Amino acid sequence: SNLLFIKRNKIFSPKDNCYIGTTFKFLKKKININFKNINLKDIHNFTEIILVGSGKGVTSVSRIEKINWKRKSLKIFKKVNHIYSKNCKLS
């Protein structure tokens, strides 16, 4: 899976040392994804975290208890999930 981090309606993904999966490559052609270094201390600045992968498709992270992070919105998740769902027919 790949991670998307949302801040001020902009989508970010870690810049370095990440395997770019098939689902991520597909979404990258459809939406604007900014690449930047993301540190654990920065996580609290994001309103949404989205997992994208071949197995589950597009999934919103609701919380990360260990660092006390909680999702604040579903706006971008709904947009990304809609793009993924309408283009990927599940059999």
Predicted regions and their residues:
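Helix-start/capping segments and mature chain N-termini
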Residues: 1-91
